[in-house]
Amino acid sequence: MATQRAHRAETPAHPNRLWIWEKHVYLDEFRRSWLPVVIKSNEKFQVILRQEDVTLGEAMSPSQLVPYELPLMWQLYPKDRYRSCDSMYWQILYHIKFRDVEDMLLELIDSESNDE
């Protein structure tokens, strides 16, 4: 009887920076592309970022992206958070890699709970 290899989720290092390349495509410092999926509810604003190789188009300027509901850039901060270019903080709720698929879930932190 053939045995299947057990797959375990990895916890990869978080990208130091994510910046928008074109609408719905972010790049990290290694030029890996991340695709966002926005999740909104009454109390929360979350985004799932999936690392997926895509053919990149021309880079867009910030003026071409206005209005855009997500930040144009995120910078990794201590306490598993990103700070966006609008000075808001996003908590990293999870970041896993499973069967070569890497996902990261971010949640916008209420500005009253932003303690540095």
Swiss-Prot record:
<comment type="similarity">
    <text>Belongs to the TCL1 family.</text>
</comment>
<dbReference type="InterPro" id="IPR004832">
    <property type="entry name" value="TCL1_MTCP1"/>
</dbReference>
<dbReference type="GO" id="GO:0045120">
    <property type="term" value="C:pronucleus"/>
</dbReference>
<dbReference type="GO" id="GO:0005938">
    <property type="term" value="C:cell cortex"/>
</dbReference>
<keyword id="KW-0963">Cytoplasm</keyword>
<keyword id="KW-0256">Endoplasmic reticulum</keyword>
<dbReference type="GO" id="GO:0005783">
    <property type="term" value="C:endoplasmic reticulum"/>
</dbReference>
<dbReference type="GO" id="GO:0010629">
    <property type="term" value="P:negative regulation of gene expression"/>
</dbReference>
<dbReference type="GO" id="GO:0005634">
    <property type="term" value="C:nucleus"/>
</dbReference>
<dbReference type="GO" id="GO:0032148">
    <property type="term" value="P:activation of protein kinase B activity"/>
</dbReference>
<comment type="subunit">
    <text>Homodimer. Interacts with AKT1, AKT2 and AKT3 (via PH domain). Interacts with PNPT1; the interaction has no effect on PNPT1 exonuclease activity.</text>
</comment>
<dbReference type="GO" id="GO:1990917">
    <property type="term" value="C:ooplasm"/>
</dbReference>
<dbReference type="InterPro" id="IPR036672">
    <property type="entry name" value="TCL1_MTCP1_sf"/>
</dbReference>
<protein>
    <recommendedName>
        <fullName>T-cell leukemia/lymphoma protein 1A</fullName>
    </recommendedName>
</protein>
<keyword id="KW-0492">Microsome</keyword>
<dbReference type="Pfam" id="PF01840">
    <property type="entry name" value="TCL1_MTCP1"/>
</dbReference>
<dbReference type="GO" id="GO:0035019">
    <property type="term" value="P:somatic stem cell population maintenance"/>
</dbReference>
<comment type="function">
    <text>Enhances the phosphorylation and activation of AKT1 and AKT2. Enhances cell proliferation, stabilizes mitochondrial membrane potential and promotes cell survival.</text>
</comment>
<dbReference type="GO" id="GO:2000036">
    <property type="term" value="P:regulation of stem cell population maintenance"/>
</dbReference>
<dbReference type="GO" id="GO:0043539">
    <property type="term" value="F:protein serine/threonine kinase activator activity"/>
</dbReference>
<keyword id="KW-0539">Nucleus</keyword>
